[in-house]
């Protein structure tokens, strides 16, 4: 949705509350998922989505539904527009060229879990 494009996120963002939490474990988890590496990856995925005329949310949901071994894709939305972006993924298919670009980003900027 663009909320986490840099380290200055809106006060109502979920991770903003995690960073302000006094529990060191919660802060550590927040830093694991919102850091320079993940912000760089987010920017790369946003640019890729823009190149294909879709929102980053649509790209993420389309990526999840692309794999037949994923039984279901769980989405979350705070607004009707976010829900519409998720639903747009049902009309969007990831072709081989786009998948190669996604995999390049994944190779260049590794997922924070591994």
Located regions from the model:
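Glycine-rich, positively charged active-site loop/lid region within alpha/beta enzyme cores that binds
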Residues: 1-47
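Generic surface-pattern signal
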Residues: 9, 20, 31, 50, ...
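Conserved short secondary-structure transition element at the edge of the structured enzyme core
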Residues: 27-91
């Amino acid at each position: 949705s663009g909320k986490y494009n840099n380290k200055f996120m809106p006060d109502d963002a979920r991770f903003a509350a995690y960073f302000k939490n006094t529990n060191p474990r919660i802060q550590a988890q927040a830093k694991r998922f919102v850091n320079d590496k993940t912000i760089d990856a987010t920017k790369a995925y946003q640019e890729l989505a823009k190149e294909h005329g879709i929102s980053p949310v649509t790209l993420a949901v389309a990526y999840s539904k692309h794999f037949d071994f994923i039984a279901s894709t769980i989405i979350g939305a705070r607004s009707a527009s976010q829900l519409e972006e998720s639903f747009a993924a049902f009309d969007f298919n990831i072709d081989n060229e786009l998948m190669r670009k996604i995999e390049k980003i994944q190779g260049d900027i590794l997922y924070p879990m591994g």
